[in-house]
């Protein structure tokens, strides 16, 4: 997380969640999101132009915006930010100058999911594993989607939080059964090193399905993760078994991460896969498999609750929370 310059009095915040295809923007006013719009990145040569068009669409003056926080896909450092899946580049100095900003904050897109977890209401969460969260302990955020995002949220007291981004999606994929090992061998033949992300992602779900079909002598009927999910929902036994295995592997990876960071404050699942198949996920063996391990580690995990985040725009909310905390810290 990086910020620049000082806050001016009485300004209005703008937040963005920028992906490879779309950029979502909103105003941040009174610690709430307003005027959410989705724009196509391909329609704008530079992100500054997208911001200007967004403000024009909602009838807001650029002059009223003094603070911006953008969630960006990829590691955020001090240098200019180059998006990996679109043509945009953010030059910090040029961005601030063109929009007349006092404050610019860039954060990793998955970090905003962690920020959002500090603010979500009960109607934006579905509890999938019962437990008792310890308010003074870390929370774990994990999300299989295009990749496997992992991060943690640390309470600092006084309503303040610290987000610790990491590369937890690239830990080794755990193998605990003969079927795990057979699938792992198929992944290793394709990729060499088998990280958790190789299985717990959109591409991973498809790879698990293809390998599973080969192991069982079943014809492949899907060419995308979405098709695997659709087959499972339609009652296809092979696809359903793969989706179940996906959820069980997610349970073990999430449980391992809780053990590593001491996330007794609970686990928050996000990403594009689990919320899409929420009913099937709730019916899966995830909750039991999460703590099914050795005596000591199983006891440690036994009372850790798990939620699925169902908020419509958690990236924007998280960007707003990150911006608010940065501004409050400046006084």
Curated annotation (Swiss-Prot):
It catalyses: D-glucose + ATP = D-glucose 6-phosphate + ADP + H(+). Its main location: cytoplasm. GO terms for biological process: glycolytic process. GO terms for cellular component: cytosol. Keywords: ATP-binding, Cytoplasm, Glycolysis, Kinase, Nucleotide-binding, Transferase. SUPFAM superfamilies: Actin-like ATPase domain (SSF53067). Pfam families: Glucokinase. ATP binds at residues 16-21. One of its GO terms (molecular function) is D-glucose binding. It comes from the Bacteria. It is found in: Cytoplasm. Gene3D superfamilies: 3.30.420.40, 3.40.367.20. Its EC number is 2.7.1.2. Belongs to the bacterial glucokinase family. HAMAP family: Glucokinase. PANTHER family: GLUCOKINASE (PTHR47690:SF1). This is Glucokinase. It comes from Pseudomonas aeruginosa (strain UCBPP-PA14). The gene is glk.
């Amino acid at each position: 997380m990086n910020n620049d310059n000082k806050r001016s009095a009485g300004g209005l915040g703008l937040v963005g969640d920028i992906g490879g295809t779309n950029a979502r923007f909103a105003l941040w006013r009174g610690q709430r999101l307003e005027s959410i719009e989705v724009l196509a990145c391909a329609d704008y040569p530079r992100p500054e132009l997208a911001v200007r068009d967004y403000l024009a669409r909602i009838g807001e003056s650029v002059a009223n915006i003094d603070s911006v926080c953008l969630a960006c896909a990829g590691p955020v450092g001090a240098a200019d930010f180059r998006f990996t899946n679109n043509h945009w580049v953010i030059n910090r100095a040029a961005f601030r100058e063109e929009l007349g900003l006092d404050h610019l904050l860039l954060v990793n897109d998955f970090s905003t999911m962690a920020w959002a977890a500090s603010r979500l209401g009960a109607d934006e969460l579905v509890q999938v594993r019962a437990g008792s969260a310890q308010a003074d302990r870390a929370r774990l955020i994990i999300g299989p989607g295009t990749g496997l995002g992992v991060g943690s949220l640390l309470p600092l007291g006084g309503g303040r939080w610290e987000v610790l981004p990491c590369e937890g999606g690239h830990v080794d994929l755990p193998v605990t059964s003969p079927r795990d090992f057979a699938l792992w061998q198929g992944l290793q033949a394709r990729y060499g090193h088998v990280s958790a992300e190789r299985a717990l992602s959109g591409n991973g779900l498809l790879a698990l399905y293809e390998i599973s079909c080969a192991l069982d002598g079943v014809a492949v009927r899907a060419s995308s993760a979405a098709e695997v999910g659709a087959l499972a929902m339609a009652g296809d036994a092979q696809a359903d078994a793969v989706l179940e295995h996906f959820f069980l592997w997610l349970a073990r990876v999430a449980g391992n991460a809780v053990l590593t960071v001491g996330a007794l404050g609970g686990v928050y699942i996000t990403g594009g896969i689990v919320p899409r198949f929420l009913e099937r996920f709730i019916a899966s063996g995830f909750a039991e498999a999460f703590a099914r391990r050795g005596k000591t580690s199983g006891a440690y995990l036994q009372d850790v609750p798990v939620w699925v985040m169902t908020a419509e725009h958690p990236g924007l909310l998280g960007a707003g929370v990150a911006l608010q905390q940065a501004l409050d810290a400046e006084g």
